[in-house]
Amino acid sequence: MWILFAFGSALFAGLTSILAKCGIKNTDSNTATAIRTIIVLIFSWIMVFLVGAQHGIGSVSAKTWTFLILSGLATGASWLCYFRALQIGDVDKVVPVDKSSAILSILLAFLFLHESISPLKLLCVVLIGAGTYLMITKKETSSENSRKKGWSWFFYALGSAVFASLTSILGKVGIENIDSNLGTAIRTIVVLIMAWIVVFVTKKQDSVRTIDHRELGFICLSGLATGASWLCYYRALQDGLASVVVPIDKLSILVTILFSYLVFHEKLGKKEAGGLVLIVAGTLGMLV
């Protein structure tokens, strides 16, 4: 059953990137992140009360609270980096870098969770890494805005990947003795606080009143998709292996690439398509 939750997470995560890109064309990415986190928080707590998990708050240990808070901080940092990268870069470049967090997650799972790395899994790591390289070194045929920003999108995307890998490991430790829905909801509170602190520190709070209604709609929809992805992901992570759940979640790249072509007309050349095949092959190889 946890496999199905993992694939559900991938589907919703793929839609999140497209919806978010549509919502941050003219809206500050940090402000958008803070707004959409409100949607995720509401969604998360609705699920908590639906399953009756709210009664477990009193039994959460100090250790679990610590790791949930740390996981929330890592998630917040990952989101802020990711949506900034999406705003200034092309979807079909940013997403592969973000999805490469699977590589670091596998290594961290080996070091801290004692999950084994077989020769096949090591080969899959190489395939994912090679595929990511091929996809991000595509010819510069993208948007004028992306060209003006150069490679700044890459460093934001890389930061997103690093923090995302830390999120998966810290989340795995933090949800061992807590309902997955409750764990997600608690982490989201941390993300929300962090996101709004960034908005006020950068003095972008006044921009909330001037956001285009259409973009605001897409931002909210991306929040709903994220909430659904999170709940599926951490439910799968609680029962399954982090080194398997994380790669399946990264299959969201297929959904994202498809819609980036349909919505933003971002086309893949032969080299980039080959890179995508390598990423998918490496991801599916993790399931063997």
Go through each PLM region and give its residues.
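Membrane-interface interhelical linkers
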Residues: 1-12, 20-68, 79-89, 137-156, ...
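Juxtamembrane helix-loop boundary signature in multi-pass membrane transporters
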Residues: 1-8, 103-162, 269-288
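Hydrophobic core positions of alpha-helical segments in small-molecule transporters
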Residues: 8, 35-36, 70, 97-100, ...
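Hydrophobic/small/kink-forming positions within alpha-helical transmembrane segments
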Residues: 10, 14, 18, 45, ...
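Hydrophobic/aromatic residues within transmembrane alpha-helices
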Residues: 23, 32, 85, 111-113, ...
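Residues that define the loop-to-transmembrane-helix transition and helix capping
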Residues: 30-31, 92, 118-120, 181-182, ...
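Alpha-helical transmembrane segments of compact multi-pass small-molecule transporters, enriched
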Residues: 39-43, 97-111, 190-194, 248-262, ...
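Hydrophobic alpha-helical transmembrane segments in multi-pass integral membrane proteins
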Residues: 44-55, 105-118, 161-176, 225-239, ...
